[in-house]
Amino acid sequence: MKVTIIGAGNMGGAIARGLAKGTIVGAADITVSDPSEKILQQLHQEFPDMLVLTDNRVAVSEADFVVVAVKPWLMKSVLAELPLQPHQVLVSVAAGITFDQLVEYTAAPEQTMFRLVPNTAM
């Protein structure tokens, strides 16, 4: 199972770290994409087997699960550029983004989608 996480900020980074430290998905099966090379370098130093990229389109190409962890106001533009395939599962952690909006932003009404509301400890 391959997981791609779009966005490596507080939430995306926490999800990537949690998955990599767990037993279900190894770091080698996780790809993280973010425009900040500094953040990506930090993740890669922690988990050398994790693939880190700045190109979202390339990042999702081999994924089974695509976790989008960007700010709600960025969701439309981020999802519009992703070449999602029918077999891929889309997971949104953006607060306030509805299923109807996800369908609109992806133009894929048959896409399997989940909305999560995770919480990280402060």
Outline where the language-model segments fall:
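Rossmann-like NAD(P)(H) cofactor-binding subdomain of soluble oxidoreductases
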Residues: 37, 56-61, 65-122
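NAD(P)+-binding Rossmann beta1-loop-alpha1 motif at the extreme N-terminus of oxidoreductases
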Residues: 1-54, 58, 62
